[in-house]
């Protein structure tokens, strides 16, 4: 369930939607693409409500997990699913779809019910990219893919973004691997948006400060901190600096840059953690 969510997506960016299982990532993408009905609030595309608005929905595509055991895909072959997509999606790029089929070495004569998890993920990727939708949402697109296939996906996504300037929202739990793709990240936790921030700026704002407890507390006094870890007489904590802010009294502490994953974990931490 989502709570009091206010979110604006700008055109021409790749967003990373990051959250734990059950945080609401799939629910959010379903709402944005009008696949789930909202209970309150508005979802607008260029000022137009997207719900039951076919003109607006032409510009949105949500690529979600394919369940090969679903009756929807019972007996369906890959090539038949792609034919349905071509008929349904107004901007379908058949040439791109065929190119990606060869790129991923997919057998289009196979029945979807016989495909592995990785292969069904490849199909969701092909549907998303070949849809050519202005706003394209991908829900855990690399699930089941090995490291080589994941790198291939990141490359073709970046190539398509560079050529088209489309807006992509990619939900993932493999944060570090995809971090370089994201111009902005959206952290979702327990149905709420923790932050929506430029990725590079967020990395520059955050530092991990560690040392003796009294030295760390002096260094971060008055600053925004998260994820405190206490080990005996020592502690470590993430500090997030506002624009123009600097840390003082850092002579006796250790400062380290933080990865996107560690920033996310720190922001989602609740009470102080004693190790």
Regions found by a protein language model. Give the residues of each.
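Conserved ABC transporter NBD signature motif
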Residues: 41-52
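The feature captures the beta-strand-to-loop junction immediately N-terminal to the Walker
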Residues: 15-20
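Catalytic Walker B motif of ABC-type/P-loop ATPase nucleotide-binding domains
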Residues: 136-140, 145
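C-terminal coupling/interaction segments
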Residues: 227-275
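Helix-to-loop junction immediately C-terminal to a conserved catalytic motif
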Residues: 33
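ABC-family P-loop ATPase nucleotide-binding domains
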Residues: 55-58, 64-123
